[in-house]
Amino acid sequence: MYHNDKKYALTNCVLLDGSEHMEPQTGKAVCIAGETISEIVDAQHIPAGYEAVDLGGKYVLPGLINMHVHLPASGRPKKKASDPKKLVKLITFCALTNRIGVSMCEGYAKTELLSGVTTIRTVGGVADYDTKIRDLAAAGKILAPRVLASNMAVSVPGGHMAGSLAYEAHSAEEAAALVEKIAAEKPDLIKLMITGGVLDAEVVGEPGVLRMQPELVKAASDKAHSLGMIVAAHVESPEGVMVALQNGVDSIEHGAQPSDEMITLFKQRKAFQISTISPALPYALFDRSISHATYEQQENGKIVFDGIVALAKANLAAGVPVGLGTDVGCPYITHYDMWRELHYFVKYCGVTPAFALYSATKLNARLAGIGDLTGSIEADKQADLIVCTNDPLRNLSALRELDMVVKGGYRIDKPQIKKMDGVERELDKFL
């Protein structure tokens, strides 16, 4: 069982507590009892009964929170695209294949944790795998992050991920009924696929074409809200963002070119954006001989990339919250590279490393509805922490190799991850 029943104190460290400016604090000890941070004290005043763990001057910060995860895929690029519908049909064929599928997703969740991500928010998965893994992780039966689970999403015929990671709704009534069906599995949120994406577009200039009509969006959102769940939506066009915000969506996943009206709607709805620069970058910036993208996919990738960045900048300037997620599972987007999304946020949106770290920890926790539980290093919060040798405020690549991951007090020293060398090599060209 992956539980901690000991008392220990992390000492001789530089503390970055998750607050917006991430001011480094020295001379402190983080005291952990069981799953929680019991107190933060001066290092010379560690309470009796706590084992002192000397970190040798290393950096301690909150565990990262990845707000946009698809557990069933590794991110390994393929020269030839496979049919996701056939793959999902194969993996859900019988009890044995389902067990294999859940086990595979458990492995990917473990990789997220070993990379320093102590909470994931899933936004489209196979069957009820997400909630199964959430419950196993919460019970300490598997080594995995905290999971905020969506299970299957709701799409429309011909829509994004329709028939694979999303059900198909043919009407507003069916959209609401599908939300009820998903809700029976006790997920934490509902995911809608409102527009197409880069791979769905058939001609240049049409990424994110509107697939789900406004009345379906409203019916699904209203039903989700009536059941106490927020609604996240895949959106990659200005029209799609407006339809989403006008009809009850709470979080815009990805984004598109902003307008004044759009930003006003974000504020009125108290909605937020989850910026996902990572999946657009390979399509937009890689040579096509490497990405294996068609000309249309590359050009549309550039449109989506520019739209996500532009909306994030506009939202930041207007005070609209912008959280971070990787869209892991897309080609070249692995379960161990959340740190790259922070780096891209700095590079393309102009924020500081401190603000990127805050966004991926305390802010993401608040947007996910778990700000009272995790996201910062404070007394009575969950002991979800990471430790690195180098200063992430100077270079976020310090998060690439960690010395320790702590999830709910359970300590993992020197976490090891098998990485994809070719993927690392290509992505490193764009640091």
What is the role of each PLM region?
Residues G158-E215:
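Active-site gating/metal-coordination segments in enzymes
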Residues G101-A109, H170-A183, E236-G240:
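Short, acidic/polar
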Residues L199-V309, A318, G323-C330, G350, ...:
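Active-site core of metal-dependent hydrolases
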Residues S226, Y295, D306-T389, L431:
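His/Asp/Glu-enriched, well-ordered alpha-helical/loop segment
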Residues Y59-L136, E215, N247:
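Metal-associated gating/positioning segment near the N- to mid-region
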Residues L90-S103, H160-A177, I230:
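Active-site mouth loops of central-metabolism enzymes
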Residues M1-K28, A33, V41-A43, I91-T92, ...:
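Active-site microenvironment of metallo-dependent hydrolases
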Residues C94-A95, C105-D130, A144-A153, P187-A201, ...:
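Divalent metal-dependent hydrolysis catalytic cores, especially in the metallo-beta-lactamase
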